[in-house]
Structure formats: structure tokens, C-alpha cells
Amino acid sequence: MRRKSAKFPFVLLPLLLLLGVLWACRPPAEAEKPSAARGGLPRVDHIVVVVEENRSFDDIYGNPSAPYINKLMAQGANLVNHYAVEHPSQPNYLDLFSGSNQGVRDDRPNHTFRTDNLAAELIRHGYTFGGYSEGLPKTGYTGPYNLKTGYARKHNPWADFANVPGSVNMPLSAFPRDYAKLPTVSFVIPNLDHDMHDGTVKQADDWLKEHLAGYVGWAQKHNSLLILTWDEDDTSHRNRIPTVIVGPMVKPGDYKAKTNHYNVLRTIGDLYGLSPLGHAKEAKPLAIWR
């Protein structure tokens, strides 16, 4: 007797084909990124880091020539026991950017490194970075100085790393007016007249208010941060510098824990789930959150 054909395979085949079509039409997965908010840290959409020059904490805190900076200190996390790592300027910029001075102990420019750094790590993990230097003649410029504009490469550490694309080394004029278009992390470097190196405290304070107050107001409503710090206090052994962090996730107040550039770098990295860089591996992230 001839056995009847089983109908089950003919029912199952269209179902499998349908499932295959549905799988092919699924929405594309987002690029894999490390999980943020490591160790209870908040999620932050954008960070802008501004680096000033050569002033101690006592030079700035309560100084009537710096009303805008003192306003930021009052509304943010005011790190009252914060220190640069060393002298002079250039090694501190490298410490803040890469967790190491890369063997540099002077201000002579035009170095080339291929080691890990904040920009390369952000880009490697699917985030973005931008360095905005006032007076930089053009995007990707690698010259040491521009005397007409007050630009100094020694204050621009991302220009020193071969693993950072030249396209992220931009003049301040490229800083977006639409802050939503900012990179994940940006550094803003005023020129020598506006960073307190050659100019006055008042000049720098006025410049900060003109160029960053708009971002600070926007950041409070858009889950973003401003970090304002100094490279060093100039020449003293103590090297205590002002540093203030402002944003909606920050708990305002004076913070007395002893911290330095490595703690700031560690905090930025941890906010985006990056591996700690250089000596930042030994530093704790800042505990300043609501």
C-alpha cells in the first residue's frame, strides 16, 4: 500500500521563509559601544573641556576680575584641592589628554607620538572628538606657533599624536553654533592673550563668558558638561589650580578630595566606558554627581 505524503514539511517551509524575511528586514543594530555610566557615573551627551594657563587657585577664587569664573564655581563642582601634575605647560596638557607626559619635560613643540590618548580611544569606540584652538591657522595645522594669532602648539596635544586624524585639529571658528552638533568630547584652547598666559585674568574671564556662556546654558538643558581647568599654577611647588565642572548631573559645592589631571581624564574615560589611559589607571573618577 502506498504511504500518504506527510504534509508537515510543506507547512513548515513557508513559515521558515517568512521568519527569514522578517529577520532580514529587522532594523540595523547600533554600532557597538562600551556601556557608559561605569561605576554609577551618569550618562553625559557632550563634554567641553576648556584649558586656561598659569594661575593658582588663589589667583582666581574670589577674584573680582573673574566674576564669570566665580559664578561657574558657585553653580558647579568646585575642586578646591586640585593640582597640576608638573611643570611647565606642555607636559600637563599631555597628562590631561593621554595620562602621561610622553617623556616631554619642556615646552619645545612638534613631537610625534603613537601611544593611546583620549581622542584615539573615543574614536576607536565609536564616539567623536574635536579640538578647537583659537588662532589655529587652518584645520590640521601642525606648525609650532602663529605669532599673529597667538596660537601655540605646546597647548594642543592632539596635534602630537599620529593616531589622531588631522581633521579633528580645528580652529575655534569651527566650534558649532548649534551645540547639538558638537563632538562627544571637545577641547577648547584660547590663544595666548585669552588663556591668562600673556593676557589678564579679566581678559580671559570676559572671553570665557563671550564664547562659552551659551554652551553652559544649553548644557544644563541637554545633559552635557563643561570642564574648566588650568594647565599649571605657573611655577610654585604646590601647583594647586582652579578646576570647576558644571552640568545638570553635577552636585554643586566645594570638593576637598585631592585630585589632579589624571582624575579628570579618568572621569571622562569612565563616562564613556573607555579603558583608563596611562597614569589615569591609578586615579579615581571624580565623585561629584547628584
Positions of PLM-derived features:
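Short, conserved catalytic or interaction motifs in soluble domains
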Residues: P27
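Flexible, surface-exposed loop/gating regions in the mature catalytic domains
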Residues: K33-R290
